[in-house]
Amino acid sequence: VDSIKELWEKNIDNIAVAAVEERSPFDTESPVTLKYPVEYSYFNSGVMLINLQKWREKKFVEACKSYIASNYENIKLHDQDVLNALLYKEKQFISIRWNLMDFFLYASPEIQPERKKDWDDALKSPAIIHFTGKRKPWMYNCDSPFRDQYIRFAKQQGWHVINNKNAIHYFFRKILYKVINKKKTIKIK
């Protein structure tokens, strides 16, 4: 929705990853489940700045495989859980505007007083909107205030946006037509 130049230019030399802190129903239980201290919180992996040099030095792919093999029963949110479990000490939180998750619009997350301004600014001027969960902007019943923006940008990029309401009506009309016009047949034994 907005330029990512500022995000792209962020210095991440001393960290492995920069991402937005996830303030969702999962955010307090995930660190406990993943066996790291709660005070490190939890980040969303939807938008990340990755320090590839640090990941290579850590042999991160091998570390992920090893973690998954020994902790698979604790992993609920796939890659995101693994990333948090392995990088919780080597991350930096970035502004919510770089990954405004749509559940922020519907939930009432606990906002620390020091993040209130960031929250308000992100809602007024998001840079990246992340449609998490079941509400997707291409679905007829999506009530996101950013749905129209999504459709406008999709059309600008040449994507055909289906009006799901019409698709659903067509589907039911087709079924109804088949049921009503079905020829009666007689089974002969």
Model-flagged regions — what are they?
Residues 1-27, 49-50:
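GT-A fold catalytic core of metal-dependent nucleotide-sugar glycosyltransferases
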Residues 24-38:
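Surface-exposed acidic, glycine/proline-enriched linker/cap segments
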Residues 11-12, 40-42, 120-123:
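Extracellular/periplasmic catalytic domains that process cell-envelope and extracellular macromolecules
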Residues 6-9, 37-38, 82-83, 118-119:
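Short, flexible, glycine/charge-rich loop motifs used to bind or transfer phosphoryl groups or to couple energy/partner
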Residues 4, 33, 112-116:
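Short alpha-helical segments and helix-capping/turn motifs at coil-helix boundaries
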Residues 36-47:
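A recurrent flexible, glycine/aromatic-enriched loop bordering the glycosyltransferase active site
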Residues 1-6, 28-32, 58-63, 141:
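A short secondary-structure junction signal
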